[in-house]
Design a protein with these regions (language model features):
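Sec-dependent N-terminal signal peptides
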Residues: 4-14
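Short, low-complexity N-terminal intrinsically disordered segments enriched in polar/charged residues
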Residues: 17-49, 53, 170-172
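Hydrophobic pocket/interface hotspot
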Residues: 39, 50-52, 59, 74, ...
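A solvent-exposed, acidic/Ser-Thr-rich amphipathic alpha-helical stretch
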Residues: 48-49, 53, 57-114
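Solvent-exposed loop/turn segments at secondary-structure junctions
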Residues: 66-68, 123-125, 155-158
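Exposed beta-sheet edge and beta->alpha loop/turn motif
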Residues: 111-147, 152
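Low-complexity, intrinsically disordered terminal/linker segments enriched in charged
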Residues: 149-172
């Protein structure tokens, strides 16, 4: 019995030492967080050049419907946004839990992955419907070096679908 207890104790210690703990470090003011802040300032100013520079040539863009696109298709989609909307504003929606009001954070994971996430509100005026639109969104960006390699969007795309439909009706 004594040998059994010692064996179980040794096995427990051995296996618990091998337990890998994955974790991440969250930053609210690092370089990548600032770059995403600048990204949305560029969107408000319709500065497509900044986006072309920040996103990797190997970008995989995943839209709210789960469809994947490459960088050229992503840039074409942003240009369409500029064509369909005016007075685009991105506002913090103060979803922070730390009281800072920050809606952008970057997490550096122990696996080596780095993701920046934004929780915000989009507002604009539709050029074809004339509608004032506003909705909350969440976007996650995966980094490879100082380039965004993956963008994943989470929001209801109905506003964009309605504006695109109005645009297509007028062009018939």
């Amino acid at each position: 019995m004594k040998n059994f207890i010692i064996t179980v104790l040794c096995a427990t210690v051995l296996f618990s030492c091998n337990y890998k703990k994955d974790f991440g470090v969250v930053n609210l003011e690092d370089e990548k967080t600032k770059l995403v802040e600048d990204l949305f300032k560029a969107v408000e100013k319709e500065n497509i050049g900044f986006l072309k520079e920040l996103f990797s040539k190997d970008l995989v863009f995943v839209n709210p419907d789960g469809e994947e696109f490459n960088k050229d298709e992503f840039i074409a989609g942003v240009e369409e946004l500029f064509e369909m909307f005016e007075n685009v504003k991105i506002k913090e929606n103060n979803n922070s839990t730390d009281g800072s009001g920050s809606a952008i954070e970057t997490t550096h994971y122990s696996t080596g992955d780095t993701w920046t996430e934004i929780w915000s509100d989009f507002s604009a005026n539709g050029k074809y419907t004339g509608d004032e639109v506003s909705f909350p969104f969440y976007i996650a960006y995966k980094w490879e070096g100082n380039k965004i390699i993956r963008e994943m969007q989470y929001f209801n795309p109905k506003v964009f679908d309605n504006e695109r439909e109005a645009k297509n009706m007028l062009s018939k």
